[in-house]
């Protein structure tokens, strides 16, 4: 499962205005912080990626949505404050799991690491 590859690291895209708190709706986010999680559970900011808001003035742009999903296609997870069903479906089609969570980024990443370890555990 996932996009981890041989080294087992993976990426998490976080929608945030300040780099501290998960506080952006997927469709309104103009920037994602890309966090790399190593196989030992440590994580760090890899980069930021600028996106075009797919939802502006009550209108949705499928073109912007598809571009944003493609831009995040190397990520295993996306953390946002909210996400609509269409965006979640588009991410899922690319193998990306979205979580709607409003919390500090560090705390949210720690929860995703626990989740990731549980679903990828081999007995």
Ranges and model annotations:
Residues 1-67, 74, 101-123:
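Non-catalytic interface/targeting segments
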Residues 61-97:
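Mid-chain, well-packed structural core segment of small domains
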